[in-house]
Amino acid sequence: MKWTDKQLDVINTRNRNILVSAAAGSGKTAVLVERIINMITDEESDVNIDELLVVTFTRAAASEMKERVRAALEEAIEKNPDNENIIKQLSLIHNADISTIDSFCAKIVRENFDKIDLDPNFRIADETEIKMIKADVIGEMLEDYYLEADEKFMSLAKQYSAGRLKDNIEELIEQLYKNACGHSDPEKWVKNCGNIYNIKTLEEFENSELLGEIVNFAKLELDGILEDLNTALKISMETDGPGCVDGLTQLMESISEIQKQNNYNKMRLAFRGVKSVTLRGAKGCDEAKKKQVQDIKKKAMDRLGKLESELFEQTVEEMAADIIKSHDSVSMIIKLTLDFMKRFADKKGEKGIMDFNDQAHFALKILLSEDEKGNVYPTDVARQMAENYKEIMIDEYQDSNYVQEDILNSVSKGQGVNNIFMVGDVKQSIYRFRQAEPGLFLHKYDTYSQDLTKDCCKIILDKNFRSRREVINSVNYIFNYIMTEKVGGINYKNGNGLTCGAKYDESINKQDNSTEIFMVEGEGREDEADFVAKKILEITDPENGLKITEEGQNKRRVKYSDITILLRSLKGVSDIYLQALEDNGIPAVADSKTGYYRTIEVRTVVSALSVIDNPYQDIPLATILISPMFSFTENELAVIKAENICEYLYDNLLLYKETGSDAEIKVKVKGFLDFLDDYRKRSVYIKVYELIEQLVNETGYDYYISSMPGGKRRHLNIEALKEKAVAYENISYKGVFNFIRYIEKLQYLDSDDGEAGISQENDNTVKIMSIHKSKGLQFPVVFLCDTNGGGRNDTDKIVVDDNGNIGVDMIDENLKVKSPTIVKRLIRRKNKQEDMAERLRILYVALTRAKEKLIITGVTKKLTKTISDLKESMYNVKDE
């Protein structure tokens, strides 16, 4: 393979702390594997494969990387069979530390459990088991607090407990705990969360960092407002523009005056000095441009007003008073969270289990210690591991968090010895919900030098070997203007765009491969999905459809299997697309993560288990009677029910067996009751997964569902249910009754795993998947659909930022009103900005999956207005 100069820099640079910013499609994995091979086979190198620590994001990636290294070594030994070093490396490949961070932590804990007095027989708990234990622990804890009737707790409960599970006090605890787990010392982090609420005087509040944060954040927001107004100014100055230069200039000067202030009170006063202006437009000007300028000005004033009302409405005295009043609520939330953390840890200890967070924190405890002054230093275990590893390689570094950073730093050489190699792409950091911290990548990106002689250096791989030039140009065009340091954390224009490295047959009509954006006028997703289906029929037409290039540069028409539909979320959306494709005769499969428990086959089998456990349940009993398992008709059930007046359907069946008037129905009832009696006896001594298997086989239900539309997936759904039953047995619960409770708990906790996936490698089928699932993959043709979705809602009753500040509501008991504290309003603003950055990165991932053709769709009820808005938003870029 011919490597680029930049790739060779990655492969050959040694004895440095290296950050590789590897853009989408830049051959990151191939380069990383080549670096490993180069290090362990270089005659001048003394590095063995088991002296490298290679950390990947997924098990599949770790397995693939180890296999690639093995294959490269085997190829090398074929060319040079007498090379003792290569033979040695092949023999050591089994001991190579190429794994996920979770597996690496597990290894540390299992090999050093005695250092932290841990039971060596622990097991990693099933995620569902952890959710169940967590819910039980919180429930028991809150019950204890309710019984104690502590005044501060009761006040908090009154404030936050109304509504659904996700809106009440339990969610507050879980949310704070989840954030804490992304930090190296969760308990310490939680304890410090309420520091801002510990103030007792106005002077303390004025000296806090909060007011400075508000001012700095407002300046960034004002930057954006001024940029929009500058766009309006440019339009006004055009030949046929509305000529509203004086009014816009006056408005911009007023806003600039706000931006100059470095003090909260002065900035608050400056806001009140802004006067709106009327932009009437010059006589004979272009009416469309006049409206465009007026709309921009209106939106700018709306943004300005919202910024003022959210962050500058209150005086310093009023804000301080709210903070002081909120102290008891915040301190109780922290107390509850710390109590939960202890009880949760104790419960896991009793059961001899841990979760992945525990594993990481136990590993950290083994590797790092703290002295009396709070200084952290590596333990003997960490120092020994650091001696063993010649280099640490971290793949997908943009998805690391603080805990992982501390773990890997603790086993690096440190102390002036540079041996950490990090590779990733911050533009593809899309796991903020898992506490990924892209700021770790960005800090190094900003501080590392491109001079490879420096101890800490960075190498940028910007050449994309995946996509056609048309796709690359589209991605660059979009992100040059929307991904900036303020929104996205990185300036895309400044050397972070893609360059085309892929070679495609340029004889294919270029127009076929240009990116297309369609805004569908319609009522909702159904209209958009139908449009997409018809577009797929168009591009797969055997005579006039789109042509793509296969390996070897052979041209052919697009097939269904070349096409992937990407969605931000599959929940409630993928079914609509599946139906639209089916209606248009297009075979499709969705990698769905929702709807599993709603599928008819799963509901039927779970109902059967419920009846086996307790037949006095009319709905599950009626469900299985009219199902293909037993094939009763609704009329037959009506006859059975009408003949005897009984409270329960099961009693009706028992009586009908003896006294029923219809001989045919009587035979069916007897057959069912005998069957049920047999299975109730079996359930006592066989495992639940065996019971499920016998049930679907002996009733012929498995054959029936396999013959239905989507039969393959339905069969796999039942197989997945059996797997859940196996997992249930493994976590020590027993019996049908507890399994039913287990399934109910899964549904209650919103742990719907989605329908079983189907391998479609050899099927000519359109694939539907989430953008997150598509990361790392590539497809000839990509439809990015349902692009109208908004960001996260601002409905959380408690918000937390990365610095450990908690934002809560302040309740006025006298007026019976609730309002967010200034801390909550600021955090909500910051979180919205971070959410926007995450959405940009998700968009980047989606667009860079396409190899040859990219199609983007959305739906709107008012097409004319949408087009007008798009024109306005694109004005800045039209001439560039």
How would you label these PLM feature ranges?
Residues 1-67, 126-128, 136, 143, ...:
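Conserved motor-region signature of P-loop NTPase helicases/translocases
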Residues 93-106, 159-184, 333-339, 357-367, ...:
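Core structural elements
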Residues 792-833:
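Conserved catalytic motifs of ABC-family nucleotide-binding domains
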